Amino acid sequence: MLKRQLHSASKRSATRFSDALNKGPSFDDFLTGRAGKAAAVDPVLAASSDGKRLPKWLKTEIPKGKNLHNIREDLRGLGLHTVCEEARCPNIGECWGGSDKSKATATIMLMGDTCTRGCRFCSVKTNRNPGPLDPNEPENTAVAISKWGLGYVVLTTVDRDDLSDGGSWHFADTVKRIKEKAPHILVETLSGDFRGNLDHVTTLAESGLDVFAHNMETVEALTPFVRDRRATFQQSLSVLRQAKVAVPDLITKTSIMLGFGETDEQVEDTLMQLRGVGVDIVTFGQYMRPTIRHLKVAEYVTPEKFDYWQKRAMDMGFLYCASGPLVRSSYKAGEVFIENVLKKRNAAKAV
């Protein structure tokens, strides 16, 4: 009798989970060319796509500035892509628009602009077979970055499950070439999970980079609803753990979006698990629905709540935490802090 009840309860739970996924967007919904009537919605500059009034703390000015224009033109000329533009980041004016180019930060997206996965929060294009890698991309990227005179650059990629190594060699080669041409530039990589292959994680971690980042995105309980089914919470945790195993003094970093309906207990548990694998830096930002095909925003989290999580993370021993409605994984204020930490470390090694 008890066995039958447990089986029945398990079946109901599985059915509810399947129903929830079926009601949400599927992988096919994100495939390139299948957008249909789902027009893009700017996550900050337009009204909320969920029918909710956008809180005042999420409104920002239209990005502008000569430096922003110059960096955009440089990218076009070299055929490079940035996640800043692909993901319509609200901080692009802050990161690109300053008068001092050496203070500017840019997040370059490698291996094309089309991902093999279809996460339910992400606006990047999706296709099962994005096409071959550009063999000239590592060199072109290194040349462009060294010419710009940027002090800190973030390299990220779309997921490339179609490649045997997930693109890890291509990624690592880009880092090495940048360091050869401009060793003073600090390089942060924001990688995918390489399908959990720890050898591929090690390839990237040992490339000479300064910061290894991989985003958890959300709490464990919501991961199957928010991310592509090939991405799991524990798999992502193992990626961050392996980066530290490969290079113990490497700074590791992750990012979490709030507003999916997570509970405080779930966020607390996530922070504890991250500290358990030695993650140094965590960022919190508000999830914004990029198009009507994507998950709805469950909650607009208040600035006060973001402040709470910033303090909680620091109390738990994280080296740094950037937390705010408009904070994104590659956030300029966080990069300035990391840059100072790395410079102090390098100076200490030189003594």
Curated annotation (Swiss-Prot):
One of its GO terms (biological process) is lipoate biosynthetic process. It catalyses: [[Fe-S] cluster scaffold protein carrying a second [4Fe-4S](2+) cluster] + N(6)-octanoyl-L-lysyl-[protein] + 2 oxidized [2Fe-2S]-[ferredoxin] + 2 S-adenosyl-L-methionine + 4 H(+) = [[Fe-S] cluster scaffold protein] + N(6)-[(R)-dihydrolipoyl]-L-lysyl-[protein] + 4 Fe(3+) + 2 hydrogen sulfide + 2 5'-deoxyadenosine + 2 L-methionine + 2 reduced [2Fe-2S]-[ferredoxin]. It is found in: Mitochondrion. [4Fe-4S] cluster 1 binds at residues 84, 89, 95, 330. InterPro entries: Aldolase_TIM (IPR013785), Elp3/MiaA/NifB-like_rSAM (IPR006638), LIAS_N (IPR031691), Lipoyl_synth (IPR003698), rSAM (IPR007197). One of its GO terms (molecular function) is metal ion binding. [4Fe-4S] cluster 2 binds at residues 115, 119, 122. It is an enzyme of class 2 (transferase). One of its GO terms (cellular component) is mitochondrion. The keyword ATP-binding does not apply. This is Lipoyl synthase, mitochondrial. It comes from Yarrowia lipolytica (strain CLIB 122 / E 150).
